[in-house]
Regions:
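Amphipathic terminal alpha-helices
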Residues: 305-330
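NAD(P)H-binding glycine-rich loop region in Rossmannoid oxidoreductase-like domains
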Residues: 44, 53-54, 59-95
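N-terminal Rossmann NAD(P)H-binding glycine-rich loop of SDR-like oxidoreductase domains
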Residues: 3-22
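Glycine/proline-rich active-site loop of Rossmann-fold NAD(P)-dependent oxidoreductases
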Residues: 174-190, 198, 209, 213-217, ...
């Protein structure tokens, strides 16, 4: 059995889709569905069971799961509050750090593979670079509580010298199908697609640094299908451990991204640059780019999709379809 926490969420459900495509359906999904629409991510997926995250956590704390621990091959821990604007620091600490620590300890106690989600938000404003070398991690200074909640678990792993016993993934700007429930945290591609359909125009934030023109701010945009391929590789290579970046390794501009959406929709670009909210200016990243040397040295050999190809697949095969969710046949 493979346990996927956050298994109804964006990356988690995409990974379940990947597991299904590899013929695996002995999967326990752990999540909190609540009143959101993310249950729709599960409809086309095959899995053994679902547990609410709080019930699962209590079972782990009591070491009393409804199955033998020896049946569990891996825990892929994607569950977290991923909102970069969440202000409740206590909630983020408990939900993103303490919960993860408890699962990691349980996995280690039972010799279970543990793969967890860190984040590129740990890099803060990027002035410390984007190296995933372990010696560099303590130097990072996140600029929001979400990033810090991820950073503090990476530091816990290093402090307890566990980096050779589990794998952490610093996801960069992930986009793709099954993100639809995320509201304000959906990708700009998703938002742009709907803006174009409704108004023909896309709005982007202006730049406030002279070295970046409006729309010239850069991100490492990575397709969720590429991410789950990397996650599958880590699952298949349990001797590969540590904290790894996961991006394409090539930053592109917001203008590139929006132009790719227009091209996929066969429309002429029309971009309006708007003022950035004051509260966002002091925590805005102008440049992110994953340094991918470490994962490649570990043996990962995979060509990431180009931005244009990824956007076209997302728009044409999902966003423009009546059911845009990942399914076993796609």
């Amino acid at each position: 059995m493979i346990i996927v926490t956050g298994g109804a969420g964006f990356i988690g459900s995409a990974f379940v889709w990947k597991l299904n495509s590899e013929g695996i359906d002995d999967i326990l999904i752990v999540d909190r569905l609540g009143t959101s629409e993310k249950w729709k991510n599960l409809v086309s997926l095959r899995f053994e069971d679902y547990l609410h995250k709080d019930i699962f956590f209590d079972m782990v704390c009591d070491d009393d799961l409804p199955f033998e621990a020896g049946r569990v091959e891996a825990i892929v821990h994607m569950g977290a509050c991923s909102s970069t604007t969440e202000r409740d620091a206590d909630y983020l600490w408990e939900n993103n750090f303490a919960y993860t620590r408890t699962l990691a300890e349980w996995a280690l106690d039972h010799d279970i593979r543990f793969i967890y989600a860190s984040s590129a938000a740990t890099y803060g404003d990027g002035t410390q670079g984007f190296s995933d070398e372990h010696a560099k991690i303590p130097e990072l200074r996140p600029i929001n509580m979400y990033g810090y909640s991820k950073q503090v678990f990476d530091l816990w792993v290093l402090r307890h010298k566990l980096e050779n016993q589990m794998a952490g993934i610093k996801f960069f700007n992930v986009f793709g199908p099954n993100e639809y429930h995320k509201g304000d945290m959906t990708s700009v591609i998703f938002k742009a697609f709907h803006q174009i359909r409704e108004t023909g125009k896309v709005r982007l934030f202006k730049s406030y640094l002279p070295q970046y023109p409006d729309g010239g701010q850069m991100r490492d945009f990575v397709y969720v299908k590429d991410c789950v391929n990397a996650m599958w590789w880590l699952l298949q290579n349990p001797e590969t451990n540590g904290v790894f970046n996961l991006g394409t390794g090539k930053a592109r501009t917001w203008n590139d991204l929006i132009n790719a959406v227009y091209a996929a929709m066969d429309r002429k670009p029309n971009i309006e640059y708007i003022e950035m909210p004051d509260g966002l200016r002091n925590q805005y990243q102008y440049f992110t780019e994953a340094e991918m040397t470490k994962l490649k040295k570990a043996g990962f050999r995979f060509d990431f999709s180009t931005l244009e190809d990824s956007v076209r697949d997302y728009v044409c095969n999902y966003l423009q379809k009546s059911d845009p969710h990942l399914g076993n046949l796609k």
